[in-house]
């Protein structure tokens, strides 16, 4: 995935499309999988809720 796919421009402002890792801080995005979000740097994982 390229960096330009992680951001978009709205009203002349840069908006991040992905969530940040709460452990690593800003700049480290969580990867989105089918059933979870995970950080490739520290291994932090959040599971998605089934509705």
From Swiss-Prot:
CC cofactor: Zn(2+)
InterPro entries given in the database record: Ribosomal_eS31, Ribosomal_eS31_arc, Ribosomal_zn-bd
ATP-binding as UniProt keyword: no
Binding site for Zn(2+): 21, 24, 39, 42
Key words, A-Z: Metal-binding, Ribonucleoprotein, Ribosomal protein, Zinc, Zinc-finger
Co-factor: note: Binds 1 zinc ion per subunit.
MF (Gene Ontology): structural constituent of ribosome; zinc ion binding
Chain ranges of zinc fingers (C4-type): 21-42
Keyword match Metal-binding: yes
Gene3D superfamilies recorded: 6.20.50.180
GO cellular component: ribonucleoprotein complex; ribosome
The organism's place on the tree of life at top rank: Archaea
GO BP annotations, alphabetical order: translation
Cross-referenced Pfam families: Ribosomal_S27 (PF01599)
Family matches, as SUPFAM superfamilies: Zn-binding ribosomal proteins
Family the entry assigns: Belongs to the eukaryotic ribosomal protein eS31 family.
Subunit details: Part of the 30S ribosomal subunit.
Protein name: Small ribosomal subunit protein eS31
Native species: Picrophilus torridus (strain ATCC 700027 / DSM 9790 / JCM 10055 / NBRC 100828 / KAW 2/3)
Lineage, top ranks: Archaea, Methanobacteriati, Thermoplasmatota, Thermoplasmata, Thermoplasmatales
């Amino acid at each position: 995935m390229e960096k330009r796919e992680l951001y978009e421009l709205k009203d002349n402002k840069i908006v991040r499309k992905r969530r940040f890792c709460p452990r690593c801080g800003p700049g480290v995005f969580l990867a989105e999988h089918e059933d979870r979000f995970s950080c490739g740097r520290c291994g932090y994982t959040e599971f998605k809720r089934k509705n």
